[in-house]
């Protein structure tokens, strides 16, 4: 199951955990309050997992691929890592399922503070359209993840500030309706 916490303001190595001191864990309920949902699945059975099939059907995730992020497998590795870590939003939900390895998704809470979400094998997460976020590997420098989409894939990131998009406006409206 994913683990989450509030981050410190350090600019040291982004691959480190960056816990606030004292630590401030973030619960799954707190993640849901910012629109982030998570699932724990059996990554060893992803090709035939009925639970994954059910999630895909219920959410109309009709397209998927698998990406491996490692210096030996991802073209333009260093450049891609910088792009992934730039704070941005998407106009569609972002769905990721970790099949191997581990990494961090960072998302903003209602007060614009960073929440770090640690994901490892078997963890699946959905980030709502319009949420500011970023991704980085952890110190293992490796992740293999399934990317899921409703319809054709769109990977266009809109770097912050991107408040003028309808997806962002809808997300901000969602935040005002949650406790």
Curated annotation (Swiss-Prot):
It catalyses: 1,2-dihydroxy-5-(methylsulfanyl)pent-1-en-3-one + O2 = 4-methylsulfanyl-2-oxobutanoate + formate + 2 H(+); 1,2-dihydroxy-5-(methylsulfanyl)pent-1-en-3-one + O2 = 3-(methylsulfanyl)propanoate + CO + formate + 2 H(+). Residues 1-21 are annotated as: Disordered. Keywords: Amino-acid biosynthesis, Cell membrane, Cytoplasm, Dioxygenase, Iron, Membrane, Metal-binding, Methionine biosynthesis, Nickel, Nucleus, Oxidoreductase. One of its GO terms (cellular component) is cytoplasm. Monomer. Interacts with MMP14. Belongs to the acireductone dioxygenase (ARD) family. This is Acireductone dioxygenase. It comes from Xenopus tropicalis.
């Amino acid at each position: 199951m994913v683990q989450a916490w509030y981050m410190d303001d350090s600019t040291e190595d982004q691959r480190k955990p960056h816990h606030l001191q004292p630590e401030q864990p973030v619960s799954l309920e707190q993640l849901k309050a910012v629109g982030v949902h998570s699932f724990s699945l059996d990554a060893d059975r992803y090709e035939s997992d009925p639970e994954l099939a059910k999630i895909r059907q219920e959410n109309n995730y009709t397209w998927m691929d698998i990406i491996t992020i490692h210096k030996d497998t991802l073209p333009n590795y260093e450049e891609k890592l910088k792009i992934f870590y730039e704070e941005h939003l998407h106009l569609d939900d972002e769905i990721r399922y970790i099949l191997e390895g581990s990494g961090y998704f960072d998302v903003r809470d209602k007060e614009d503070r960073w929440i770090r979400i640690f994901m490892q094998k078997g963890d699946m997460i959905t980030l709502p359209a319009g949420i500011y976020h970023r991704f980085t590997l952890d110190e293992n420098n490796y992740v293999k993840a399934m990317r899921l989409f409703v319809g054709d894939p769109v990977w266009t990131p809109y770097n912050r500030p991107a408040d003028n998009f309808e997806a962002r406006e809808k997300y901000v409206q969602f935040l005002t309706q949650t406790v």
